Amino acid sequence: MTQTSSLWVGVISLFPDMFDAITDQGVTGRAVKSGLIDFNCWNPRDYALDKHRTVDDRPYGGGPGMLMMVEPLKKAIAEAKKAAGDGAKVIYMSPQGRKLDQQGASELASSKKLILIAGRYEGIDERIIESYVDEEWSIGDFILSGGELPAMTLIDAVARLVPGVLGHNQSAEQDSFSDGLLDCPHYTRPETLDDKQVPAVLLSGNHQEIAKWRLMQSLGRTWLRRPDLLHNLALTEEQAVLLAKFQQEYQKACG
């Protein structure tokens, strides 16, 4: 980890060039270029034992598909851990892992050093997981061709929580899920678009009323679209009043 970086990330992948999407573009790209995030990649193919740089092997017991070869993967993990120094958390991106959410991203951001293993083929040897992996994480109940896209998703979610990565300190705080709620609607110019007006309160200049409106919309949108999230929240008195007001206005509008 460099002196200025707030997050050290190491990725083990057979396709390291895929990660150019987050190291060269957007807020994560700027964070890498500015040194807030120290990003590194290790390709198991560089540690292959034969001239063909073989990185896959047959699974014991037969069956379709191949597994990532153990020795190149072990060496890549060892090199990543050596570069990271003490305290690095090794994560395997796996559909069997804990499902990533905002709370999980916040927990991972506090780790400061992350080594992500992006699997390919049918996965990796179970003994590698048992001996070298600290945690398994998933981005959802669906199948992808490899762990690179899940790893990039995790990196992006965690990077947004690193101080200084976003242009405005409140940006991460106002994102969906940051307080357990969905985000409120947002509007920009023009004031009228296809005969639809920007809500008057947003033009009022009354910051207290604007904040109250945004909170009410956030509560209402969560109630409409993700009511399960409300079950995990202990609403304040103000939030309960605003949600009740939103529900009343919504039911009135629906007739």
UniProtKB/Swiss-Prot annotation:
Main location: cytoplasm
NCBIfam families, alphabetized: PRK00026.1 (NF000648), trmD (TIGR00088)
GO terms (BP aspect): tRNA N1-guanine methylation
Reactions performed catalytically: guanosine(37) in tRNA + S-adenosyl-L-methionine = N(1)-methylguanosine(37) in tRNA + S-adenosyl-L-homocysteine + H(+)
Enzyme class: transferase
One Gene Ontology CC term in the entry: cytosol
Function: Specifically methylates guanosine-37 in various tRNAs.
Keyword match Cytoplasm: yes
Protein name as catalogued: tRNA (guanine-N(1)-)-methyltransferase
Recorded GO MF terms: tRNA (guanine(37)-N1)-methyltransferase activity
Binding-site positions, S-adenosyl-L-methionine: G119, I139, G140, D141, F142, I143, L144
Domain of life: Bacteria
Keyword hit for Membrane: no
Oligomeric and partner information: Homodimer.
Record's keyword terms, sorted: Cytoplasm, Methyltransferase, S-adenosyl-L-methionine, Transferase, tRNA processing
Pfam families: tRNA_m1G_MT
EC numbers: 2.1.1.228
Family: Belongs to the RNA methyltransferase TrmD family.
